[in-house]
Curated annotation (Swiss-Prot):
The keyword Lipid metabolism applies. Keywords: Cell inner membrane, Cell membrane, Lipid biosynthesis, Lipid metabolism, Membrane, Phospholipid biosynthesis, Phospholipid metabolism, Transferase, Transmembrane, Transmembrane helix. It comes from the Bacteria. The keyword Ligase does not apply. It is found in: Cell inner membrane. InterPro entries: G3P_acylTferase_PlsY (IPR003811). The gene is plsY. Its main location: membrane. Its EC number is 2.3.1.275. This is Glycerol-3-phosphate acyltransferase. It catalyses: an acyl phosphate + sn-glycerol 3-phosphate = a 1-acyl-sn-glycero-3-phosphate + phosphate. Pathway: Lipid metabolism; phospholipid metabolism.
């Protein structure tokens, strides 16, 4: 009975829309209506700034990590712990606080594996960050992470968590289906391109201001 209640509680905790709470409370923005219309850390970072994106990421990771860590202490059975972990992920994807809509579950998926397969998760996360750094696509990095994790678990002999990692892979890939289409068509948003466009726009604006100045003002600016 305790196990069933804990699975239900894990779903409710996973449903907590921290991205929506943070963006609305501190930025006055509804992330469901702006940017990529997603409550995840990436969209919150785009709309509210890097710091609030990190805060969202941490909250979404913790709402996966804490219930799973406690579940492991209640009953270390891989079946029970996996059900609790999957409940956290499904809560994020189908939030009971947002009419059963939600995010893409990458951060919460990271959270559930923190207490279960730390080193395998670390290796997959480093590969994820490398892909994001090289390509500029957060979505591609996220897909790399959930694809690499089952491989890392299998290679290291952690068979108990392999079914969970495959279920998480299926959920995350399904939630990224539109991103996959955009990646294939070359229309996916890139962090690198966004930064370059912002820098170019700033340089263009500065150039326009200089052209509009009289010679004396331009001289003072150069000095």
């Amino acid at each position: 009975m305790l196990e069933i209640l804990w699975i239900a509680l894990a779903y409710v905790l996973g449903s907590a829309p921290w991205g929506l709470v943070i963006a609305r409370t501190f930025c006055g923005i509804d992330p469901r209506e702006s940017g990529s219309r997603n409550t995840g850390a990436t969209n919150v970072a785009r709309l509210c700034g890097f710091g609030w994106g990190v805060a969202t990421l941490l909250c979404d990771v913790l709402k996966g990590a804490v219930p799973v860590w406690l579940a492991f202490r209640i009953n270390a059975s891989p079946v029970f712990v996996s059900m609790v972990a999957l409940a956290c992920v499904l809560g994020h994807v189908f939030s009971c606080f947002m009419k059963f809509r939600g995010g893409k579950a990458v951060a919460t998926s990271i959270g559930i594996f923190l207490p279960l397969a730390f080193w395998q998760l670390l290796a997959s996360s480093l590969l994820c960050m490398l892909v994001i750094w090289r390509s500029g696509f957060v979505s591609l990095g996220s897909l790399t992470l959930v694809t690499a994790l089952p491989v890392a678990l299998a290679v290291s002999g952690q068979w108990g968590w392999l079914p969970l990692s495959l279920a998480v892979w299926a959920v995350v890939v399904w939630k990224h289906r539109e991103n996959i289409v955009r990646l294939r068509s070359g229309t996916e948003k890139s962090w690198l391109k966004s930064k370059n466009k912002g820098a170019a726009a700033g340089n263009a604006a500065e150039g326009d201001d200089t052209q509009n100045m009289n010679p004396q003002d331009a001289g003072r600016k150069d000095g």
